[in-house]
Amino acid sequence: MSPQTETKASVGFKAGVKEYKLTYYTPEYETKDTDILAAFRVTPQPGVPPEEAGAAVAAESSTGTWTTVWTDGLTSLDRYKGRCYHIEPVPGEETQFIAYVAYPLDLFEEGSVTNMFTSIVGNVFGFKALAALRLEDLRIPPAYTKTFQGPPHGIQVERDKLNKYGRPLLGCTIKPKLGLSAKNYGRAVYECLRGGLDFTKDDENVNSQPFMRWRDRFLFCAEAIYKSQAETGEIKGHYLNATAGTCEEMIKRAVFARELGVPIVMHDYLTGGFTANTSLAHYCRDNGLLLHIHRAMHAVIDRQKNHGMHFRVLAKALRLSGGDHIHAGTVVGKLEGDRESTLGFVDLLRDDYVEKDRSRGIFFTQDWVSLPGVLPVASGGIHVWHMPALTEIFGDDSVLQFGGGTLGHPWGNAPGAVANRVALEACVQARNEGRDLAVEGNEIIREACKWSPELAAACEVWKEIRFNFPTIDKLDGQE
């Protein structure tokens, strides 16, 4: 017998293929406080038992491969393997199951969302034994959370920087999103900020195109910020999109924003990538910049109910990677968003401790151990008639981000901003007086129209606008 054969035999190696469930399905396993827990929606191929499918997910996202290998004997699989510890059927779905998987913490590099996702949502999503696979939720243990910096500043620090309390913040995305010159773009920024908004915003696909190079845009927007601040006495900001083709270029743009003295920059965190996002978040914390996050590309990943990844997971990942704002849907606007599910991940963004609540899609209790919170941004097809609902749904710690709902005002950009601000102030005052925004919202807006012609004009323009389409990604049991 050759020395190599003797080595393989001595570690108990037996070539061949064995069922995943013999090693990776462990219903007797008691999860540890340090485990990362995952809830997967599994749709096995016909003939594949759910236990085998769940075990395959645990194996292929941790230590397993398609066949037995002799190097298994050179490490402790019991220490490092993922374990499918529970499987439950999905109500109303005969072919779908929720498989719960526990991962030992040592499988993941500290402070790296990139590494965590490479394992948990990597090659396993193309596994042939599965017709579809979706990651519904993750439990991030405090031991892992503490290896991340998280948001550069967080909700309270942002309010202190801006000196704005007791109400949602107001924003506006400059439109048209592409094609304006830098000077005309800066003019629109100035008019919106002067009219009463707290922020204006680059659209997600505004980077540095031939019609408007980034440096010109930054300069004209900075001028607009300082001019509007001088005229209103309020602190203003514009989300300057630093997203670029390389991390080095992205940081260069953030450095220039800091040199201009503006308060906030922006990043497209999914198209830019988690490594770039975490690097930018670290820079922003070290240099006093707030960081606005856009979620462009999220619907490619999260919209289909049986495959991909739910946005609550992307939201948790962003809180770890770092961002002070993130777009979170509106419930009432033009973009996808179920109310209970949206409120669930809004709490996961803002709160320090969130209890398990399956009625809102929260599969695990999440303790953030004082990691700073993230402001959810409601954006997409909203206007003044939505203000009572938005104020009631999202509360004070949020950003209500208009676009066409400001710039589409018949009298111009500044009157559009005035209408937004008046509607918000009316809703906040009514709420503070004990009125029910959900019931009396339209009446509150009509009353405010009596002393704001700008709001009255906006209400007339958008009184018939509706986006009455069913939500595709509903919580189980809501069909």
Swiss-Prot record:
The keyword Protein transport does not apply. The modification Phosphothreonine is found at residue 330. Keywords: Calvin cycle, Carbon dioxide fixation, Chloroplast, Disulfide bond, Lyase, Magnesium, Metal-binding, Monooxygenase, Oxidoreductase, Phosphoprotein, Photorespiration, Photosynthesis, Plastid. It is found in: Plastid, Chloroplast. The disulfide bond which can form in the large chain dimeric partners within the hexadecamer appears to be associated with oxidative stress and protein turnover. Mg(2+) binds at residues 201, 203-204. GO terms for molecular function: magnesium ion binding; monooxygenase activity; ribulose-bisphosphate carboxylase activity. Residues 1-2 form a propeptide. The record marks 334 as: Transition state stabilizer. The modification Phosphoserine is found at residue 208. Substrate binds at residues 123, 173, 177, 295, 327, 379. GO terms for biological process: photorespiration; reductive pentose-phosphate cycle. The keyword Secreted does not apply. It catalyses: 2 (2R)-3-phosphoglycerate + 2 H(+) = D-ribulose 1,5-bisphosphate + CO2 + H2O; D-ribulose 1,5-bisphosphate + O2 = 2-phosphoglycolate + (2R)-3-phosphoglycerate + 2 H(+). Belongs to the RuBisCO large chain family. Type I subfamily. This is Ribulose bisphosphate carboxylase large chain. The gene is rbcL.
